[in-house]
Amino acid sequence: MTLGPLMIDLKGVTLDSEERAWLGHSWVGGVILFSRNYESPEQIAALIKAVHALKEPRLLVAVDHEGGRVQRFRDGFTLLPPASLLGKLYDRDQRQAQRLAMITGWLMAVELRAVGVDFSFSPVLDLDRGVSAVIGDRAFHGEPDAVIALARAYIRGMAWAGMAAVGKHFPGHGSVVADSHTALPVDKRSWRQIREGDLLPFEHLARAGLPAVMPAHVRYASVDSRPVGFSPFWLETVLRGQLGFQGAIISDDLSMAGAAEVGDMSARMQAALSAGCDMALVCNDPDGYALLLDELKGDPYPQTSPRLLRLYGRYPLTRSQLYHNPAWQRAVQMLAAYGEF
């Protein structure tokens, strides 16, 4: 049995019979969690355990847990700083900033691993050009070298906790005003401008073994007519061919307005997978899941599984083990020294 190439979300804090049927479908290989699915560490651990028990290989469980304004689980978890705080510290003290980035990545990952989450969709590798409000303080910095240094440290911390990193939003969402949640942003810069700036963090980290990437719902008009997540040129020619990326590609949410031009949800999913995505992410469409899954017959693409299987979390631990871990205690104290976020 293979791991299916579709990741969906859930309605609430427990599984109902309809969701169990969705998750049991051969095309479904993962679940993304949101704040609406969370009440407490104990509750989310029980929910994830129920998801994992549904089938083998077990479903991947993911969440957006970057820190700052994008942290789905808050009460009972350490509040993490926005990436930009690390960037500001980098301008004053590069070594200290990289140390804090590593500790932040480890702390984020180890707390999620303690409730059973496999991976977070992080870190953000976009450059903060002072243009995009939806990216803004989610980005480490505006300069590629700073983003590379901080992201490498952050990813190292994640790996020590047993979590694979997902770099986003390839090839860079930081130079467009529009928010792809509500519109399709169009970036009119030249290939050279993108290649010599935004692409650099993705290139360096791809060559360092970045486990996964999420493409942007952005059209780079001077390069290709299709949004990146539906573009074989961007995903196969550039990301895999030119940058040497060997990890998994997971689409951004296909229910976003930035994906709407491709067609209905079935057309979007098929287009993303055909372009080179290993997994298609579909959120906030519970009424559409039954229709979508009914259209998907037979076994999905078995060749996608090897890259996806490398995203399973490692080094399982309990919350009790976490709380009694001196490294966790030191990390929480160190982060607290930088104030509330």
Curated annotation (Swiss-Prot):
GO terms for biological process: carbohydrate metabolic process; cell division; cell wall organization; peptidoglycan biosynthetic process; peptidoglycan turnover; regulation of cell shape. The record marks D179 as: Important for catalytic activity. Gene3D superfamilies: Glycoside hydrolase, family 3, N-terminal domain (3.20.20.300). It catalyses: Hydrolysis of terminal non-reducing N-acetyl-D-hexosamine residues in N-acetyl-beta-D-hexosaminides. Keywords: Cell cycle, Cell division, Cell shape, Cell wall biogenesis/degradation, Cytoplasm, Glycosidase, Hydrolase, Peptidoglycan synthesis. It is an enzyme of class 3 (hydrolase). SUPFAM superfamilies: (Trans)glycosidases (SSF51445). Its EC number is 3.2.1.52. GO terms for molecular function: beta-N-acetylhexosaminidase activity. The active site is at H181 (proton donor/acceptor), D252 (nucleophile). Substrate binds at D64, R72, R138, K168, H169. It is found in: Cytoplasm. Pathway: Cell wall biogenesis; peptidoglycan recycling. Its main location: cytoplasm. GO terms for cellular component: cytoplasm. Plays a role in peptidoglycan recycling by cleaving the terminal beta-1,4-linked N-acetylglucosamine (GlcNAc) from peptide-linked peptidoglycan fragments, giving rise to free GlcNAc, anhydro-N-acetylmuramic acid and anhydro-N-acetylmuramic acid-linked peptides. Belongs to the glycosyl hydrolase 3 family. NagZ subfamily. HAMAP family: NagZ. This is Beta-hexosaminidase. It comes from Nitrosococcus oceani (strain ATCC 19707 / BCRC 17464 / JCM 30415 / NCIMB 11848 / C-107).
